[in-house]
């Protein structure tokens, strides 16, 4: 992406990653594991760092350190995604958990999650944001949206508008601190 983004008007020095649900999980994992060969087979020498991450309603702790914060996700993940159980291969589940990779080098994060999410419990975002704030040297913003459900931003609404506006403001601040002009 960094090698080609300039051809399309983008700035290779300011790449931001985002995603919702599984994309929230994967974007967080990618943001926290730049340059780790195990996560980028075939392009181990490529700079995969990002300037910021903005995950929406993601799963951040697959091993469920909070007890009950995965509410049935373990069965789905073991059958369809990881293809092994947590009991049989805890190390692999840890490696796939963004919270396991939180550290001082984490990029700025803006985590968004709804309180009424029935797919991914809000406790996932709370504990992830707390872990980031406790260890990262960069800004960490957490927006917990009252009564918002999973995928709250799919349909246009006032809530979606405000969430998008908040993300835009966050990225403008990160961009200005990153040394780039804000749009």
Identify what each model region corresponds to.
Residues 1-183:
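Alpha/beta-hydrolase superfamily serine-hydrolase fold, recognizing
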């Amino acid at each position: 992406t960094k090698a080609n983004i300039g051809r399309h008007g983008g700035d290779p020095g300011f790449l931001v990653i985002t995603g919702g649900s599984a994309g929230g999980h994967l974007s967080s994992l990618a943001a926290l594991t730049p340059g780790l060969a195990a996560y980028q087979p075939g392009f181990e020498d490529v700079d995969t760092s990002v300037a910021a991450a903005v995950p929406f309603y993601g799963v951040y702790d697959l091993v469920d350190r909070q007890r009950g914060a995965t509410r049935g996700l373990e069965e789905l993940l073991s059958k369809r995604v990881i293809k092994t159980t947590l009991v049989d291969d805890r190390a692999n589940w840890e490696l796939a958990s963004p919270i396991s990779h939180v550290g001082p080098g984490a990029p700025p994060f803006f985590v968004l999650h709804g309180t009424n999410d029935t797919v991914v419990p809000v406790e996932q975002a709370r504990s992830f944001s707390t872990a980031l704030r406790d260890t990262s040297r960069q800004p960490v913003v957490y927006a917990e949206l009252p009564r918002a459900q999973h995928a709250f931003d799919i349909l246009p609404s006032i809530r979606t508008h405000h969430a998008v506006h908040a993300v835009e403001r966050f990225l403008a601040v990160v961009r200005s601190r990153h040394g780039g002009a804000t749009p």
